[in-house]
């Protein structure tokens, strides 16, 4: 949240913050959808590889200062693109609940989660092949308001990427080279 006196704006969308603070800036994503898709394909493959490295005994560990297990975080890395793809392919609203959905019972260990990640990665690649020439300026509904498909793709990429850094750090804390 960003506040000025008795007014505030939720800082979910950079465009809202820029307008609220009356800053002259263009919040349009700098990378094209094609560049974002290329990077995301790599990022998802890195995530799959990192998840495979987690010992199953560590999955119930809690993140520092956060009531979230490592298992939930590992799943979340792939639930983010799943929510994006559901929005794109099924016209399902991009909700906070969908993005933060808990891992299903069938995902019991690191191998199960990495297999789920591989499925999502392959689904993303197929989606991109079909969508690359579509209109990314089209507005879509999300839990933080209407946003362009381009902005939602960018947000999806950076969100997963931020969690990749967490995975690397957790592996390093276990003295496992990422």
Q: Predicted segment positions?
A:
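Acidic/histidine-rich alpha-helical segments that form the ligand environment
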Residues: 36-53, 104-137, 151-156, 161
């Amino acid at each position: 949240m960003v506040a000025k006196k008795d007014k505030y704006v939720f800082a979910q969308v950079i465009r809202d913050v820029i307008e609220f603070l009356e800053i002259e800036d263009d919040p349009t994503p700098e990378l094209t959808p094609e560049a974002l898709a290329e990077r995301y394909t790599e990022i998802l493959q890195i995530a799959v590889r990192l998840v495979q490295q987690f010992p199953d005994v560590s999955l119930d560990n809690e993140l520092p200062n956060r009531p979230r297990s490592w298992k939930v975080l590992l799943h979340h890395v792939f639930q983010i693109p799943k929510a994006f793809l559901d929005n794109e392919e099924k016209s399902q609203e991009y909700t906070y609940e969908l993005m933060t959905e808990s891992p299903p019972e069938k995902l019991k260990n690191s191998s199960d989660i990495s297999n789920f990640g591989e499925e999502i990665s392959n689904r993303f690649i197929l989606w991109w092949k079909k969508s690359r020439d579509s209109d990314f300026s089209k507005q879509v509904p999300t839990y933080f308001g209407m946003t362009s498909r381009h902005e939602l793709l960018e947000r999806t990429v950076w969100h997963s990427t931020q969690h990749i850094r967490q995975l690397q750090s957790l592996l390093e804390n276990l003295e496992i080279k990422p």
